[in-house]
Amino acid sequence: MSLLSLDLSTKSSGWAVFDGNKLNDYGCITSSSTDLIKRIHIMTDGIKEILNKHNIEKIVVEEVRPDLGGSNLQTHRALMWLQASIAFLIHDEFNKVQIEYIYPSSWRAACGIKNGRGIRRESLKQYDVTFVKETFGIQVNDDIADAIGIGYSQINQVSNEINWE
């Protein structure tokens, strides 16, 4: 199965393509525009290019969740709009591709990265970069590291099925 994993942002979105258990390609789509809608178009167009280049069967996206207490509503809204833009792209042009969403705590746990109360976001980003360097032998920025971690969590899922044979 060919999998595209995404760590979405309207300024710098990390992505990774896995074919089976192999990391096949990765990168980052960036935009410095001050216009939010233009940034969303740039991100969506970049993802469309990746989908046209690779035969993707499934996309896994880091779920958007407002920070409890100190949430930045404007940022949350922008990320939700970006997710919607990608959902429309998939629906309209790549309708055989599945989209799934995963919470950061879930994919990090699957990668063996300790997270939860008391661990700062900045520390987690560095742990993600270190995980990718140790697991794949590559040095990447935190956006790409997150995308690779998201994909890794999917390709290394343990089956809970019981084999009765």
Regions inferred by a protein language model and the residue ranges of each:
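Phosphate- and other anionic-substrate recognition elements at nucleic-acid/protein interfaces
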Residues: 1-165
